[in-house]
Amino acid sequence: GWINEEKIQKKIDEP
């Protein structure tokens, strides 16, 4: 769990 983890997960969810 780092800070960018949330942003990366969102990028994977919606292109």
Swiss-Prot record:
Which GO molecular-function terms appear in the entry?
Answer: toxin activity
What's the domain of life for this entry?
Answer: Eukaryota
List the GO biological process terms. defense response to bacterium
What tissues is it present in?
Expressed by the venom gland.
Q: What are the entry keywords?
A: Antibiotic, Antimicrobial, Disulfide bond, Secreted, Toxin
> What GO cellular-component annotations does this UniProt entry give?
extracellular region
Function, in words = Has antimicrobial activity against S.aureus (78% growth inhibition at 1.8 uM).
According to its UniProt record, which protein family does this protein belong to?
Answer: Belongs to the long chain scorpion toxin family. Class 3 subfamily.
What is the protein name stated in its UniProt record?
Scorpine-like
Query: Which organism encodes this protein?
Result: Opisthacanthus cayaporum
Organism lineage reads as: Eukaryota, Metazoa, Ecdysozoa, Arthropoda, Chelicerata
